[in-house]
């Protein structure tokens, strides 16, 4: 958890540039580069979040090829564009749990009109990587999503947007050599003559989640923005048979415009599906084995996300292209539920975060 009274400019600061070029009415080129705080070791190309060609064979069909945003959430198209939403940041309970910003591949969308409603069906296929800190140390883990595919259905009418997403991917975690050395020591215990020890070692490796696995993702979202009222709600479910990433998360938000000001509130919740991991007693094997069991159990439990968040704030649109926001977040973090915070911790906490941002476009 953050130390008391820490002030930083890094958490929500970012600078982005977009470029669009219309080759002809059927072909468009687009790119977006976002500079923001990233984990050490991040490659420069990770800052390139768009780099694609969009082809429109008809007014109803669009095909994009290249690097695009994974259209998995309500805010996928503009999650880095602060002036586009009322809060200081999107719900951390849902969006921080799935920090996937880019996908390399292709998507095809088809749009049609039905009376006053506009529908769109999009399918996608590609791959993407995202970085995270290891639950057991300061080592990083790169989650590689391969053969990712899915479909999104949206409906817009009179200021209301409804959407549903269903997708899947093959996922593998890649980390430092020291992490794999620990895994090899754990695997050696899976052939221990004591069947209890062997089973405990297999369970620890499964819950550690370093091996290739299938990830399933489902999302439902709804938003309304008309006249003086804005509200939204979103639910996401991630199912992975190994590791601690299986979870469900949701948020609801309500806002009211009063002249140039918008006041809002948001409630969020994130729940890991993995039960608390008990520490095996391997003291009879060796001190090294017990240390390994303790460290892995601590890291697995420390990467579980079980928290609730209440956010209250206001936004002042003092210029057509600028907005000043102030937001207070209060978190209820359960024991062994701090997976959305930096560094593993098994303790419960109720931190507060006060944020102020100036969002602008030019």
Residue map of PLM features:
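Surface-exposed strand-loop-strand hairpins of Gram-negative outer-membrane beta-barrel proteins
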Residues: 1-13, 136-139, 335, 341
């Amino acid at each position: 958890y953050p130390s008391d009274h820490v002030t930083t400019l890094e958490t929500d600061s970012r600078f982005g540039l977009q470029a669009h070029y219309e080759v002809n009415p059927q072909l468009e080129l687009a790119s977006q580069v976002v500079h923001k705080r990233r984990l050490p070791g991040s490659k420069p190309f990770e800052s390139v979040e768009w780099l694609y060609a969009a082809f429109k064979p008809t007014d109803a069909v669009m095909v994009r090829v290249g690097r695009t945003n994974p259209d998995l959430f309500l805010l996928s198209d503009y999650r880095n564009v602060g002036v586009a939403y009322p809060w200081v940041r999107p719900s951390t309970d849902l969006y921080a749990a799935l920090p996937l910003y880019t996908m390399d591949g292709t998507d095809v969308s088809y749009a049609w009109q039905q009376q006053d409603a506009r529908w769109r069906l999009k399918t996608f296929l590609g791959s993407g990587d995202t970085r995270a800190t290891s639950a057991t140390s300061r080592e990083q883990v790169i989650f590689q999503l391969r053969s990712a595919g899915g479909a999104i259905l949206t409906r817009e009418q009179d200021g209301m947007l409804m959407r549903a997403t269903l997708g899947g991917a093959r996922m593998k975690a890649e980390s430092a050599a020291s992490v794999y050395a620990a895994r090899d020591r754990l695997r050696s215990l899976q052939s221990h003559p004591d069947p209890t020890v062997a089973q405990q070692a297999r369970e620890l490796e499964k819950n550690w989640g370093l091996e290739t696995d299938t990830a399933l993702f489902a999302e439902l979202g709804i938003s309304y923005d008309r006249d003086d009222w804005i509200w939204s709600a979103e639910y996401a479910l991630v199912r992975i048979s190994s590791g601690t990433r299986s979870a469900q998360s949701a948020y609801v938000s309500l806002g009211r415009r009063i002249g140039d000001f918008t006041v809002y509130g948001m409630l969020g919740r994130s729940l890991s599906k993995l039960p608390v991991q008990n520490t095996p007693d391997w003291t009879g094997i060796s001190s090294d084995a017990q240390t390994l069991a303790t460290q892995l159990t601590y890291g697995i439990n420390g990467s579980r996300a079980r928290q609730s968040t209440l956010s209250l704030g206001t936004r002042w649109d003092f210029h057509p292209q600028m907005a000043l926001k102030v937001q207070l977040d209060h978190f209820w973090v359960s024991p062994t539920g701090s997976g959305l915070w930096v560094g593993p911790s098994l303790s419960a906490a109720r931190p507060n975060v006060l944020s102020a941002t100036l969002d602008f476009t030019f």
